[in-house]
Amino acid sequence: MSIGRSWRRPISTLASALLLALAIAGPARAGYQATAESNESGFEPPCVDFSDSLPAKMLKAAASAYTRLGYATGTYTMSSFTRAHTLMRTVSDWGYYVHTHGDYYWHPGDQRRYSGFREDAGKCTQAVIYSKDIAAKRAGRPTNLVVISTCHNAEANTTLPAAFGIPKMKSTVDKLGPRFYLGYLGNAFDSDEWVFEQRFWDALASLHSVGEAFDIANLGSFGHADFAADWWGSYTWYGFSGPFVPACSRCL
């Protein structure tokens, strides 16, 4: 569901915000870490009975997009994408992308379910990274741009946005700050996710806000009629790394 029109601001205000963002993006902001991870083993034999080339393409596209937005981006897959490594890096992440299997997983110790996703680790038996694990490491610190390219992790009961310090609200950057969470509902096929994400990254590269980029990505057709995505955060933000610093005290 798109609600883009209700979040748009006057062109003059958007132009000021964009000029500020462009001024502070790029190499000068290289200290803002992002992690991009993709589960390739879980989409290849012997883990499944087919070979899927999209996880590698999706990782490359995401890493390029985050780098373009000013993040110091590390990419991890197969044996380098492990639960332990993800939780080590999340402490310092300002941006995070993952493509893998996701669900509302049962936690045996807590006897309840949490949103989460699976590591790669170069094997077919893949540990779950629960939202509670990420929340414990981040301790409430907000993340800038989070894209969870999995099944089920943008449904109403998802606990992942809060783990990354992003409220499940739709607002503007002056209200929520520079943060945006994107995910998919139900059983999402990576062929549809790939189409959506290409449109999303291209729109950001064309200097659309994250909310506008989401709306653009939703346009057109997908291979499965029930494909759906959702977001929470600041519609009017442009995705650049780091904290929001207004140009002056009266700009917002």
List PLM regions with ranges.
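C-terminal region of N-terminal signal peptides and the immediate post-cleavage residues
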Residues: L22-G31
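Caspase-like (clan CD) cysteine peptidase catalytic core
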Residues: D120-T150
